[in-house]
């Protein structure tokens, strides 16, 4: 989420300054989470690279893993869904991890992510305009608030 929220803060800055600031502030929390996970990996004797294990191999994370919507509603929905997925993942991990200290860290991070969910839901309610239909040409609209200018 760090790279995505950085991107989102940039493309929303000019026309949605408050949204941009929310992404900046939430991103600071997400960077702290990344730091916590990195330090935890080191303490557990693991290399803190940005990679994951899948089907017997290590795969590096890259920004191409992100989705980059530019419609304000889709952008906020994507961020909200990412937070919800993270909460589910951390809950699942806390179920099988036996170390109480690590579970406590996960629970603290879950609390942060739940706050982010509330923030994104609040922002979505402010921008509750329907998205233009993708199967037809969008009509000219005098209201430029549905798409983040690029």
Task: Name the predicted role of every residue range.
Residues 1-150:
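Non-heme di-metal
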């Amino acid at each position: 989420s760090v790279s995505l929220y950085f991107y989102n803060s940039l493309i929303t800055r000019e026309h949605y300054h408050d949204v941009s600031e929310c992404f900046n502030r939430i991103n600071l929390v997400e960077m702290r989470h990344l730091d916590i996970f990195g330090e935890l990996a080191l303490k557990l004797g693991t290399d803190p690279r940005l990679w994951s294990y899948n089907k017997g191999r290590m795969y590096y994370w890259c920004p191409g893993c992100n989705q980059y919507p530019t419609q304000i509603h889709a952008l906020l929905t994507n961020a909200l869904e990412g937070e919800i997925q993270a909460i589910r993942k951390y809950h699942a991990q806390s179920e099988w991890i036996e170390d109480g200290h690590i579970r406590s860290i996960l629970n603290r991070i879950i609390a942060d992510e739940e706050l982010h969910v509330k923030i994104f839901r609040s922002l979505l309610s402010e921008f509750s305009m329907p998205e233009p239909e993708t199967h037809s040409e969008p009509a000219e609209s005098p209201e430029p608030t549905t798409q983040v200018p690029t």
